[in-house]
A protein has these predicted regions:
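Loop/helix patches that line or flank the sugar-binding groove of alpha-linked glycan CAZymes
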Residues: 1-135, 143-145
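Short conserved micro-motifs at the rims of enzyme active sites and ligand-binding pockets
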Residues: 57-60, 148-150, 166-168
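Residues immediately flanking
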Residues: 140-141, 179
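Surface-exposed beta-strand/loop patches in extracellular or lumenal glycoproteins
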Residues: 141-153
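Solvent-exposed beta-hairpin/edge-strand motifs
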Residues: 151-161
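C-terminal beta-strand-rich structural cap/linker in extracellular carbohydrate-active enzymes
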Residues: 165-184
């Protein structure tokens, strides 16, 4: 990686990690991160090789003589197809499905309101939009399943399941909860 710091002897901090996100985080966490990005206010921007789940390219780093090449693939369409395995393809397809779904939900308009919920670690909670069309985003950023209490019946737009009461949220799982048009 590349490091930055001051000559005065202050602590040195990483500037860039020089690692492919899929290799560092794994495909499940990468999909969660991309989905969180789509859940936030504004217009999400994605780095194509990360969406594709490109692994570290150790050969490129060695051949080019610098670490930055590890996550900057130069591929033809044919070689890109060879690199992508089923897990990466299904993760990419799931992200595309989620982004298409996002486009249909008014709460995810780039200018829609956003409020951060005060939840216990490792849960992250965000409310997007306004009632009755708001969406509550719940993400488990930890490594163990954790429980979240859904106060009123809601529909998880991602899993297409009705949820209510105490719900177990798996590691790297993200929920898009909507109460619009839900009858108890």
């Amino acid at each position: 990686g590349t490091w930055s710091g001051h000559v005065s002897g202050e602590e040195i901090h990483p500037y860039e990690m020089n690692v492919a996100p899929a290799s560092l985080f794994g495909m499940d966490r990468l999909l969660t991160g991309h989905t969180l990005l789509a859940s936030l206010r504004g217009v999400p921007a994605y780095y194509f090789p990360a969406v594709e789940g490109e692994p570290n390219d150790l050969e490129a780093a060695e051949n080019e003589g610098h670490n930055r090449a590890i996550n900057r693939p130069k591929r033809t369409i044919e070689s890109r197809i060879e690199v992508l395995d089923d897990a990466r393809t299904s993760s990419r397809d799931e992200l595309i499905r989620r982004l298409a779904l996002r486009q249909t939900i008014s709460a995810f308009h780039p200018d829609a309101q956003q409020r951060i919920l005060d939840l216990e670690d490792p849960l992250l909670g965000i409310v997007r939009g306004e009632e009755p069309a708001s969406v509550t985003v719940i993400a488990n950023l930890g490594f163990d399943a954790t429980n979240y209490v859904v106060e009123e019946p809601a529909f998880d737009l991602l899993s297409e399941q009705l949820v209510h009461g105490e719900v177990s949220v798996a590691p790297s799982e993200i929920l898009w909860l909507s109460t619009a048009d839900i009858s108890s």
